[in-house]
């Protein structure tokens, strides 16, 4: 590079350093204002803790009671959109079983009626050692005529069990069979003034059923035998659909109802007019007018009820 080129480059550098400006050096220079401090953000409020389920079992209760009831605090409850969780408290004293509940299902709630899901505090008290009436005649059938509505017991999760018929509305299903009319969820319940069950799905009321969708969620392939699903208002237990004949541990049977569908009838309306009770001889298999029978069983009760497999007539689509 020759001297002329060096001078040119140097001159450019000097002009660049001077900025080419022509400002008045005597002008006053304003001080730079101090920056405005950023506002302190408000603290983020702690989230409201989600409600949790409650389960309390009295240590004084006998072992078969402790085994019968499910720990609903381990279940997910009716769903995030419902600000409620199941509560179940069981105690035993003075020869009685006392159950307190808020009537909230432990599984996802699926609306099947116009009624909202609400918490409703309930208390049920039944004898720990119920006895059979000396007359051995049903004491409550037909108390309100042929219509059997309302409280007929409670489940092992603290839900109402209602009778086999619905109310008088809608007219085309008045006093009909809610299973046949397809107005129950997959666990056999729906809402009125409170959530309640008209039917049982054993998958929802066994120790493996404490999930969001127990009717369809995978479960171990277990054949539940003489499982207590709930209790009647007299204190006798309600077993599931399988048991051993005479508690022999060998001969597995599925008890059957002695009510038979009358030819040409269906239980869409006035379900009680669609069936007739036909007494059978084999009392190990066929149940009495209250859907129960007497024989030895693993839980020590002489008499007990059964929920049954729903086979006929086929429920409506």
Stretches found by the model and what they are:
Residues 16-17:
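C-terminal motif of bacterial Sec signal peptides marking the signal peptidase cleavage site
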Residues 200-272:
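Short helix-loop boundary/capping segments
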Residues 277-309:
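C-terminal structured interaction module
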Residues 310-317:
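Conserved small/polar residues in nucleotide/adenosyl-binding loops
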Residues 30-50:
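Ser/Thr-rich, Proline-interspersed low-complexity disordered segments
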Residues 139-232:
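Extracellular-facing segments of soluble proteins and assemblies that are Gly/Ser/Thr-biased and enriched
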Residues 1-7:
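Bacterial N-terminal signal peptides that target proteins for export
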Residues 49-175:
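Solvent-exposed N-terminal domain segments of exported/luminal and surface proteins
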């Amino acid at each position: 590079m020759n001297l002329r080129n060096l001078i040119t480059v140097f001159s450019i550098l000097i002009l660049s350093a001077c900025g080419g400006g022509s400002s008045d050096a005597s002008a006053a220079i304003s001080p730079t204002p101090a920056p405005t401090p950023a506002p302190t953000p408000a603290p983020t409020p702690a989230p409201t803790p989600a409600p949790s389920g409650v389960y309390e079992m009295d240590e004084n209760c006998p072992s078969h009671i402790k085994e019968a009831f499910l720990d609903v605090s381990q279940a997910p409850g009716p769903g995030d959109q419902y600000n409620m969780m199941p509560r179940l408290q069981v105690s035993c004293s003075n020869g009685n079983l006392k159950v307190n509940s808020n009537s909230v299902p432990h599984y996802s709630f699926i609306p099947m009626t116009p009624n909202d899901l609400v918490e409703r505090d309930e208390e049920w008290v039944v004898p720990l050692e119920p006895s059979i009436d000396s007359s051995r005649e049903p004491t409550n059938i037909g108390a309100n005529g042929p219509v059997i509505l309302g409280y007929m017991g409670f489940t092992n999760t603290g839900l109402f069990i209602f009778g086999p018929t619905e109310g008088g509305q809608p007219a085309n299903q008045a006093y009909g069979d809610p299973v046949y009319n397809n107005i129950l969820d997959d666990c056999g319940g729906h809402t009125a003034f409170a959530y309640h069950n008209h039917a049982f799905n054993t998958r929802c009321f066994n120790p493996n059923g404490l999930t969001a969708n127990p009717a369809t969620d995978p479960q171990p392939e277990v054949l539940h035998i003489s499982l207590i699903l709930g209790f009647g208002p007299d204190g006798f237990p309600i077993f599931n659909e399988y048991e051993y004949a005479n508690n022999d541990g060998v001969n597995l049977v599925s008890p059957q109802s002695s009510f038979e569908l009358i030819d040409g009838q269906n239980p869409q309306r006035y379900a009680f007019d669609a069936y007739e009770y036909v007494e059978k001889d084999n009392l190990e298999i066929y149940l009495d007018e209250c859907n129960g029978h007497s024989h030895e069983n693993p839980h020590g009760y002489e008499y007990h009820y059964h929920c049954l497999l729903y086979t006929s007539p086929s429920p409506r689509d």
